Amino acid sequence: MAMDKVGVSISEMQRLLGIKQYRTAWLMAHKVRKAMADRDSRYRLAGLIEMDDSFFGPRGKKPGRGSERKRVVLCAVSLYRDREGKERAGFAYMRVVEDGSAESAGDFLERLGCGPTTGEGRQLLEAIRTDGWRSYGKVARDKDLKHCKVILRDPKAAGRLLPWVHRVISNAKAVIRGTHRGVSSKHLQSYLSEICYRFNRRFWEKEIFDRLVLACVSTQTITYKGLVGHETSELAS
């Protein structure tokens, strides 16, 4: 779960570790995902971020915003420039939200660090780069953020004009479809947290396992009873 870029399915984990009961492996994986989410919740994004939404759920006739039976997921990736001046991705964060409204986007940004300031009084989060969806413009004004709006005349150009955030989204959908063969909407957030945790530590391959063990022993545990409930399987699309 820590080092494989596409994660590991519960069945494969069960086989590798010699765990007899599927339920035991499933619970263990969710305990690890909670530790991942708790550790990443300590961090805040700063400077400029790329931000966009996507839809996770069963395939349907109606694509994009307004899709039925799909969960809205907001994704943000912080950006910085390397020594050669090339834009690079820093930290990624994904969250399941109620809808694509400015209110949902505002709550999302507050979780990322919008509001807290530096010693000089500047916001940690200064600017967002998004497509032209009206909710982003409104939340940028409400939060006093610079808004770098990218006009997408062709939806297929999103991956080129907002490359990092769409790379993270595409990776998440590939993992959910491929490795896990779909996940329930109830537990979608924990899988997204796992995917972001690995992405955020992609340069720490030698340390990531030990860091995850430390996160696991220092987080509040979760029980099987707290995890289960009525749910239906939904494939990412």
Task: List where the protein language model places each region.
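Residue-level recognition of single "structural anchor" positions
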Residues: 1-237
